[in-house]
């Protein structure tokens, strides 16, 4: 099994009209294309033991225990990994609840799609979900898998604390979400775009783009200026980053 690509979506997209923040993992499941979960000896029982919260996943049945039924009947690795990624985020306090897995035109290659709250956490959990599927499928020690999950959940919580907005910016973004206004985080700090296209507005902490302050700050930061121009399609030197 091999992760071919992990992409991060931050706005309107092909996969969902509602969910804007999505991870798209292109995954080659290799030999597991011929081994659905009902053909992997002991997988169902081991999975239930290490992630009991999967019982809450309704999946296509639309009821509690629905996903477990799918696993027992036989489903493919990409679908299971999608649910692992969602459950691990839930354990870390980031309940997003949206996922899709679709086969591509190439045999054994799937697009595993799931929502995230924090981009860095989303990319981290994609790799963790693949790792745990392989550990369970290969019959690795249950206690070690449980210890690994506990450690990863704590790591995700710490990542979120490191990258989450401060109180002021967070309050503005939360209110924007309540009003149905999409947002994109533009850097690792507090520069945020609210809305899209001609209707977009930008804030930095509690400062709006109605003042010159954001422009002055960006112009005084060479790396931030380079990134902003590069994101707009203006050719810039790569520099040291």
Task: Label every model-predicted segment.
Residues 114-241:
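Conserved N-proximal alpha/beta basic substrate-recognition cap immediately N-terminal to
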